[in-house]
Amino acid sequence: YFNNLAQRKFTVLKDNTNPLLDVTFDGVHILNNDIVSPNPHIVIELNDENPFLILNEDIDTANFQIEIKYPNSSNWNRINFFNGALANLEWHINEQENKFIIEYNPLFDQDGIYKLRVQGQDKTGNSSGDEPYQINFEVIQKSSITNIYNYPNPFSTKTHFVFTLTGSEIPNKLNIQIMNINGRLIKQIHLNEIEDIKIGNNMTNYYWDGRDEFGDPVANGVYIYRVISEINN
């Protein structure tokens, strides 16, 4: 038999790479001071590229700091995972991608500006950034459609529609009717059937190309539009 011994030096480098933090509200990366639903689905993901240090569902909650500041308050309220944990807070691990996923479904019952602050760390202690992720968002309880306009205006080939939706429910009917100055309907657009409408600011992917219901170009001039919406009839 062989009785050989081989030795070789090797170096282990410390993990210095920051994990990636991603935060969405109802599937959207919101901008600062955007309007959101009073009961949003907030998803927080921490993605670590190190395949040798797998995040742990039970232990690594300590590596997160999630805080909310309510309207007219100067205090940050920490969201707890265990002692005093909220029923609307869940978390799990995607082991294949080494991703820690937190799902938070709060009910914000005050109108006003809220602040969310999040910081996460991987197993080595690398933070997701030098500063915590922080964003302001606004909650408006009343259901309304405001700030409606088409863009660009005037237009030559196509125009999109922009509007702000508030409240907690998406209308099950949201139509835009375009009429001439005599009030005759020339085009009806069923936005809820062709658009992914969300609470907050919306700009349609759909564009009106200046054609009527029969596909014929309309004459140059001024046209009027109105919005008809229904929530649960």
Walk through the language-model features, giving the residues of each.
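Glycine-centered coil/turn sites that cap beta-strands in beta-rich domains
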Residues: 136-151, 155-182, 188-193, 204, ...
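Short, compositionally biased serine/threonine- and acidic-rich segments at solvent-exposed termini, linkers
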Residues: 1-152, 156-158, 166-168, 222
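Generic short beta-strand
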Residues: 66, 118, 175-177, 208, ...
